UniProtKB/Swiss-Prot annotation:
Tissue specificity of this protein: Hemolymph.
Family: Belongs to the tyrosinase family. Hemocyanin subfamily.
Cited function: Hemocyanins are copper-containing oxygen carriers occurring freely dissolved in the hemolymph of many mollusks and arthropods.
KW Transferase (keyword) present: no
Subcellular location: Secreted, Extracellular space
Name recorded for this polypeptide: Hemocyanin subunit 2
Molecular function GO labels: oxygen carrier activity
Lineage: Eukaryota, Metazoa, Ecdysozoa, Arthropoda, Crustacea
Record key words, sorted: Copper, Oxygen transport, Secreted, Transport
Cystine crosslinks: none
GO CC terms, sorted: extracellular space
Protein backbone atom coordinates (compact mmCIF):
# COMPACT_ATOMS: atom_id res chain seq x y z
CA UNK A 1 0.00 0.00 0.00
CA UNK A 2 0.99 3.62 -0.24
CA UNK A 3 3.08 5.13 2.61
CA UNK A 4 0.92 6.77 5.29
CA UNK A 5 -0.46 6.28 8.81
CA UNK A 6 -4.08 6.25 7.63
CA UNK A 7 -3.38 3.28 5.35
CA UNK A 8 -1.75 1.39 8.21
CA UNK A 9 -4.76 1.98 10.45
CA UNK A 10 -7.09 0.30 7.93
CA UNK A 11 -4.75 -2.70 7.65
CA UNK A 12 -4.90 -3.35 11.37
Amino acid sequence: DAPGGASDAQKQ
